Swiss-Prot record:
Organism for this UniProt entry: Listeria monocytogenes serotype 4b (strain F2365)
SUPFAM superfamilies assigned: FMN-linked oxidoreductases
Role played: Involved in the biosynthesis of isoprenoids. Catalyzes the 1,3-allylic rearrangement of the homoallylic substrate isopentenyl (IPP) to its allylic isomer, dimethylallyl diphosphate (DMAPP).
Name of the gene this protein is made from: fni
Keyword NADP set for record: yes
Any single biological process term in GO: isoprenoid biosynthetic process
Name this protein carries in UniProt: Isopentenyl-diphosphate delta-isomerase
């Protein structure tokens, strides 16, 4: 039985990658398109003046992008993790591995995650677990990677669509609080593409969580992935569940939103999307599906070249926004329009204040 469970987990990991790559073949419309930065025609800064440095859980990083959690736990995904680690090392960006549950249950799979630290010995690596994982096991996940931080992913919608998924969630908050108090490294609580509301973020902040990844809808859709894995595809009605990255970001502009650090991910497509997310308060921006898609289609070298180009393009966008660094960018005026503006108004976000920031 144990062997069958291991095989099922390995197959699921491979299916996640294959279906995720397929989803990223065509970029979906993004709620970030409803966000417009108000720039300048007389910039104060030169491109060489721009400082893209940011901080993630107390660690300074030179570029506000990270490779978000996606994979590990099978022979095939070991190769992908190795290539992602090479990209992270060369571009000097943090990287999170996918859920390490498989390796915690089957030690023969540890190397499919550990390869990340072997290839990127000095980089910022985030371990990744579910709130289902008991503390001692979670500490093993951190040790496995010599991780700099721990991602705890919260994914009730995915679990409910997954036939073999969890059905009990009421203990999650207590478990997360235990990690916050006892983890030897900082904790980041992240969604998996269904987005966090300000109420969810407040619930987490109240137990001591200091950083969240809002991880909105718009990128890799794990409800669809799990539904596609089902023979009956019985959860078609849930494929649009959640809030988008744009919605999650403007929700954090509400006067009652908790004042904690947040990251943004979910449907990030280009440097302009990154700038919009940073301008709405994110400290850094995560990508998973698009990077794996680029890796699969173009290889490691081309993906590195693409991300290096993004650095230069990002500096240019900061110039246009009249911002020398991320702190200044967070005061750039923004116009929210379309469906995102309607949603924001119903959530009582002061869109006029956003449009006239200084």
């Amino acid at each position: 039985m144990q062997k069958n469970d291991d095989l099922l987990r390995e197959r699921r990991k491979d299916e996640h990658v294959a279906l995720g790559v397929k989803q990223n073949e065509q970029l979906a419309p993004s709620s970030l398109e409803d966000i417009q930065l108000i720039g300048t025609s007389i910039p104060r800064y030169n491109v060489k003046d721009i400082d893209l440095t940011t901080t993630i859980v107390g660690t300074n990083v030179p570029f506000p992008l990270y490779i978000n959690a996606m994979t590990g736990g099978s022979r095939h995904t070991k190769k992908i993790n190795a290539e992602l680690a090479e990209i992270a090392r060369e571009v000097a960006i943090p990287m999170a591995v996918g859920s390490q549950s498989a390796a915690l249950k089957n030690s023969s799979l540890i190397d499919t995650y550990k390869i990340v630290r072997e290839i990127n010995p000095n980089g910022m690596i985030l371990a990744n677990i579910s709130p289902e994982v008991a503390l001692q096991e979670g500490l093993r996940a951190i040790e496995m990677l010599e991780a700099n931080a721990l991602q705890i992913h919260i994914n009730p919608a995915q679990e409910l669509v997954m036939q073999e998924g969890d059905r009990s969630f009421s203990h999650w908050l207590t478990r997360i609080e235990e990690y916050v108090k006892l983890s030897p490294v900082p904790v980041v609580v992240k969604e998996v593409g269904f987005g966090m509301t300000r109420e969810t973020v407040k619930t987490l902040a109240d137990i001591g969580v200091q950083t969240v990844d809002l991880a909105g809808k718009g990128g890799t859709n794990f409800a669809q992935i799990e539904n596609d894995r089902r023979r009956d595809q019985a959860y078609d009605f849930l494929l649009d569940w959640g809030i988008s990255t744009g919605q999650a970001l403007i929700d954090m502009q509400h006067q009652d939103a908790p004042k904690i650090a947040y990251l943004a991910s979910g449907g990030i497509r280009n440097p302009l999307d990154i700038v919009k997310a940073l301008a709405l308060g994110a400290d850094s921006v995560g990508m998973a599906g698009q990077i794996i898609y680029s890796l699969k289609k173009e290889g490691v070298t081309k993906t590195i070249e693409k991300l290096e180009l993004w650095k230069e393009q990002l500096r240019g966008l900061f110039v246009l926004a009249n911002a020398k660094n991320i702190s200044e960018l967070k005061t750039t005026p923004l116009i929210i329009s379309g469906e995102l503006a309607k949603w924001g108004a119903l959530r009582e976000i002061d869109l006029v204040k956003l449009a006239n920031r200084k």
